């Protein structure tokens, strides 16, 4: 059977041969003098020392360096030089520096083996796995801080930490988790699978992609460095005047946001350029996978909203170092300026986190329902609608902090309106599940949990959009529970679904199903037992970020804390499964274990560096499950093999 006469696009599809000008050499290692994570750490440390010395020298002529009387110039210079040293040590600056001095950049070396995961690499698949490691590092660190928080809240009178230490732990936990969550899907799964799903051989700008990863990791180190400097007491929102009054740890917070913001902008721009310009022939917008739609909407938010955060962080750094007064009220500034800048980014950021999770679920459930995705166009439109409306709701975070009362009804309305496109996305999932013969594999269980958790988080969000309710419960545990249900209950559960679904393709090794089931049920049960009581605690008046509370709330807090410890243990099951399945007792995965129609499953495993020997021509969308006579997903230009609508690969005569 041949499809060559039916191709919608006549394109040249020769076997892949790397151009001579872009040829790469292959070797297993790089030697101790080559650039890798070790040299990056050393260069970053030396850069920190040099920057601190230079900052002290520059600021020595200032009688008063900052509004707090501290030498924040030296702190900032140290962090800047640390990041530059880190990037230089990993090799991220080799190419631009060579071009800057007019020299030809050296050919890239394509490393094999484990060494490639600890170096600057231009393969989007390697970058995706590097992001996985980085995100898991964020998650582990933030999780340990969460355990410390719940340990303190076991007793309202017997304290593990001082009040000052407690608020700094809360602040560090919130900031690390928010920055991790901003990249938890778009970094690992977006970078890895978007080119595969659209039939591309690479990202539009591979160096920018790799650069965004190492900047992301540098931002993590900058934010985590706040703890040795005494932390910051502002919570993850960094509100002034606490921001301007805080110690040197605040510089780490502001510069960390600045650095991670640069990486987020680079990632968003690169993903958008790739999706718009690198789709395979025949992949019209109505054939783009729903996960790619979610990444495109997220990339638009990253590109448009993140510059506001970067500018806001820069203003705060100037206030801390050279005595400008953007947020210093007594010198003519306004603390409301930071709140507006922060939340103009901060609420789109909620959907930067949520939209990729919706995309993962929309991509997975048709596979295990063996049904086409219900109302595909509505799902895509819902994601675009959420992205657009997310820019018009940020003022609901200021209902109590000085917003003009006449503006409250407008932002209450826009906040309620955003539930409409979100509801469309939710109903698309319900329509797909309706009357389906569902296979309850581990990825599908996590997807079902996403709908359950996000329904609770979404309904509680509708209450919070109402001004009287918001004013009543603002600053309490009700808001905290709502937020964790939407972000952790939605995004992190979706990320786990994506890992269990796609890791067999990423590594060629299947995860242990029994451990996966243990992980799911413990995580799902103890997540709800941890955070649902917080709705009650919040309605009873317990404030956030305070290490003591009314004695009558101890039972609920103890119940929540014990559940949180068991929730943390569920992640240990995941890490054990990861180590067992991928390293200790690896089992080779079938080429397409879930019988998915997705284009990413139609290439070889392990995936070759160039992804596809021939660029496919897309014939239809990837959701024609259980449809008799459905067309093949794509023509791969190989007359001997046809990729069928069942997800299998057959020879031209129909034999398996």
What spans do the regions from the language model cover?
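Membrane-embedded and interfacial regions of multi-pass energy-transducing membrane proteins
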Residues: 2-6, 10-656
């Amino acid at each position: 059977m041949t499809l060559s006469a039916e191709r919608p696009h006549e394109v040249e599809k020769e076997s892949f041969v790397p151009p001579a000008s872009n040829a790469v050499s292959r070797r297993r290692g790089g030697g101790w003098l080559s650039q890798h994570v070790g040299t990056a750490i050393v260069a970053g440390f030396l850069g920190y020392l040099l920057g601190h010395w230079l900052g002290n020298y520059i600021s020595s002529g200032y009688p008063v360096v900052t509004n707090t009387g501290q030498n924040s110039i030296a702190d900032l210079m140290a962090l800047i030089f640390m990041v530059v040293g880190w990037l230089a040590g990993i090799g991220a600056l080799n190419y631009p520096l060579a071009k800057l001095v007019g020299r030809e950049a050296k050919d890239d070396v394509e490393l094999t083996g484990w060494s490639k995961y600890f170096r600057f690499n231009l393969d989007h698949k390697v970058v995706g796995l590097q992001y996985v490691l980085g995100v898991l590092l964020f998650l582990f660190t933030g999780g340990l801080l969460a355990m410390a928080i719940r340990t303190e809240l076991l007793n309202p009178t017997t304290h593990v930490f001082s009040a000052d230490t407690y608020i700094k732990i809360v602040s560090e936990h919130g900031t690390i988790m928010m920055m991790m969550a901003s990249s938890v899907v778009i970094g690992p799964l977006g970078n890895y699978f978007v080119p595969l799903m659209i039939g591309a051989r690479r990202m539009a700008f591979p160096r920018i992609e790799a650069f965004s990863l190492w900047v992301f990791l540098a931002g993590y180190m900058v934010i985590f460095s706040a703890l040795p400097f005494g932390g910051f007491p502002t919570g993850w929102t960094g509100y002034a005047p606490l921001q301007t009054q805080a110690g040197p740890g605040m510089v780490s917070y502001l510069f960390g946001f600045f650095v991670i913001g640069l990486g987020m902008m680079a990632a968003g721009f690169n993903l958008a350029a790739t999706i718009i310009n690198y789709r395979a022939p025949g992949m019209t917008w109505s054939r783009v996978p729903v996960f790619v739609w979610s990444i495109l909407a997220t990339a638009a938010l990253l590109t448009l909203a993140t510059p506001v955060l970067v500018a806001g962080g820069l203003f705060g750094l100037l206030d801390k170092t050279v005595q400008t007064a953007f947020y210093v009220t007594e010198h003519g500034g306004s603390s409301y300026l930071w709140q507006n800048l922060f939340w103009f980014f901060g609420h789109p950021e909620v959907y930067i986190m949520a939209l990729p999770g919706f995309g993962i679920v929309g991509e997975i459930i048709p596979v295990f329902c063996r049904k086409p995705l219900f109302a595909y166009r509505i799902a895509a439109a819902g994601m675009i609608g959420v992205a657009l409306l997310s820019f018009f709701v940020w003022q609901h975070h200021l209902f109590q902090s000085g917003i003009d009362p006449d503006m409250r009804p407008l932002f209450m309305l826009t906040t309620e309106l955003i539930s409409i496109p979100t509801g469309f996305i939710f109903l698309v999932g319900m329509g797909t599940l309706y009357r389906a013969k569902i296979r309850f594999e581990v990825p599908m269980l996590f997807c079902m949990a996403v709908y359950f958790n996000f329904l609770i988080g979404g309904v509680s969000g509708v209450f919070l959009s109402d001004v009287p309710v918001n004013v009543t419960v603002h600053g309490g545990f009700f808001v905290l529970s709502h937020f964790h249900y939407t972000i952790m209950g939605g995004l992190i559960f979706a990320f786990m679904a994506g890992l269990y679904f796609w890791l067999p393709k990423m590594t060629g090794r299947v995860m242990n199903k029994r451990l996966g089931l243990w992980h799911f049920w413990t995580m799902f049960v103890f997540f709800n037992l941890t955070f649902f009581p917080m709705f009650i605690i919040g309605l009873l008046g317990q404030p956030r970020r305070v290490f003591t509370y009314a004695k009558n709330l101890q039972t609920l807090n103890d119940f929540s804390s014990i559940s949180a410890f068991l929730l943390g243990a569920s992640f240990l099951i995941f890490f054990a499964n990861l180590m067992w399945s991928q390293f200790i007792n690896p089992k080779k995965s079938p080429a397409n274990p879930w019988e998915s129609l997705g284009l990413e499953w139609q290439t070889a495993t392990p995936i070759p560096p160039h992804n596809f020997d021939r660029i496919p021509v897309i014939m239809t969308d990837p959701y024609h499950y259980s449809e008799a006579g459905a067309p093949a997903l794509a023509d791969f230009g190989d007359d001997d093999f046809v990729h069928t609508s069942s997800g299998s690969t057959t020879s031209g005569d129909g034999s398996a």
